[in-house]
């Protein structure tokens, strides 16, 4: 997939109506509408402001949750609208329907320098079905389509891919940044390239591991998925998380890494516990002599030393997935140590690939010291797998 896409900087937007696909699918209190994390809204502000500063009229599109074509008040975009008005310090009208009379009237009346937000697109079933007529109707509202919803880039929906068949289509500034960092890290990285993989299941990361084995110099494996790799070495893992269907795959990957000259580091030691609880006492165990009645909860100090040492020598670091149960303070050391080691690498390109690892970095306090934190979850994973993302592939390539 070509990552060198045209952006809003490459076209004239003055006096034009812009259909801007954002990702305002933010965690919020369904009763009060209070937003818990506004990262996705804040991340697209540079694009909105650029368009307004260049005399464009901006029609914002987004989804929220999974209403399955039903109108659900708790999944309305009113909370995102209210927050946007505060951030932009200007009115942001919210349409009362999706492509009904109110949407069409508000968009028709929109002037350069003004913004309107269309209500949750998933209130219409046609959105997720990528219905061509629905996409065509959306496109009829504007002159240009701008895609800035990286978190939805892996979805071929009417507002992410469908509209591109009817309008000139370019990337927003957030998507430009995602492609610049994630694309270069995979295709032309500053070496050595160190990939850190964590999280629960091996099955969730099969495509990522397969792709990174072709590209990385070193792969560090922690989190719940590491116990499946330990089991592949014939080790006892006690009551730790085991992806039993993928022990054979893990064994093959260990052999393949060796064959390809990729350094694959697994935990030497772990912090374990008798039960999965925030109050459980951490017990340090050797990975090669794991007690049968304990479960692994985090990587241990020797492993932290190994992993941070590998990060210290890196030119590029990509991280996806926590090293342990970071939500429990007693088992957050490994995750925090990785975040700190990345933050300390001033000369390296340091990228966090969305999801739990992004939350962990924010919680660790090192987020502002890293090169890039992806706003995608599923999109970031599919990007790391080397898959084609429909929301990106449909955008115009640079000349």
What does each model-found stretch correspond to?
Residues 1-399:
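Active-site loop-to-helix "anion-binding N-cap" substructures in soluble metabolic enzymes
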């Amino acid at each position: 997939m070509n990552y060198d896409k045209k952006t809003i900087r490459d076209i004239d937007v003055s006096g034009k109506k812009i259909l801007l696909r954002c990702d305002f699918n933010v965690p919020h209190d369904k009763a009060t509408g209070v937003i818990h994390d506004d990262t996705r809204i804040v991340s697209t502000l540079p694009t909105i402001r650029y368009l307004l500063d260049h005399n464009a009229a901006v029609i914002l599109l987004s989804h929220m949750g999974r209403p399955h074509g039903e109108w659900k008040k708790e999944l309305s975009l009113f909370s995102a609208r209210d927050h946007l008005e505060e951030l932009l310090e200007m009115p942001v009208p919210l349409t009362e329907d999706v492509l009904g009379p109110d949407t069409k009237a508000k968009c028709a009346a929109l002037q350069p320098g003004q913004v309107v937000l269309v209500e949750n697109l998933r209130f219409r079933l046609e959105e997720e079905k990528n219905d061509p007529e629905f996409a065509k109707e959306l496109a009829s509202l504007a002159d240009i389509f701008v895609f800035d919803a990286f978190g939805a880039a892996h979805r071929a929906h009417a507002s992410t891919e469908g509209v591109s068949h009817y309008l000139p289509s370019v990337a927003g500034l957030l998507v430009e940044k995602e492609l610049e960092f994630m694309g270069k890290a995979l295709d032309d990285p500053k070496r050595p390239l160190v990939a850190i993989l964590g999280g629960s299941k091996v099955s969730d990361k099969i495509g990522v591991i397969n792709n990174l084995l072709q590209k990385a110099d070193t792969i560090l494996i922690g989190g719940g998925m590491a116990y499946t790799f330990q089991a592949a070495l014939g080790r006892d893992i006690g009551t730790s998380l085991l992806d039993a269907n993928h022990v054979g795959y893990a064994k093959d990957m260990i052999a393949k890494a060796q064959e390809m000259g990729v350094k694959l580091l697994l935990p030497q030691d772990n912090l374990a516990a008798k039960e999965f609880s925030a109050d459980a006492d951490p017990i340090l165990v050797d990975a090669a002599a794991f007690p049968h009645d304990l479960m692994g909860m985090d990587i241990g100090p020797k492993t932290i030393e190994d992993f941070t040492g590998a990060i210290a020598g890196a030119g590029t670091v990509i991280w996806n997935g926590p090293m342990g149960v970071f939500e429990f303070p007693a088992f957050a050391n490994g995750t925090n140590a990785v975040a700190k080691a990345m933050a300390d690498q001033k000369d390296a390109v340091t990228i966090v690939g969305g999801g739990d690892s992004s939350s962990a970095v924010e919680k660790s306090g090192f987020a502002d010291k890293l090169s890039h934190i992806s706003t995608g979850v599923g999109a970031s994973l599919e990007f790391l797998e080397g898959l084609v993302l429909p929301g990106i592939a449909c955008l115009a390539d640079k000349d």
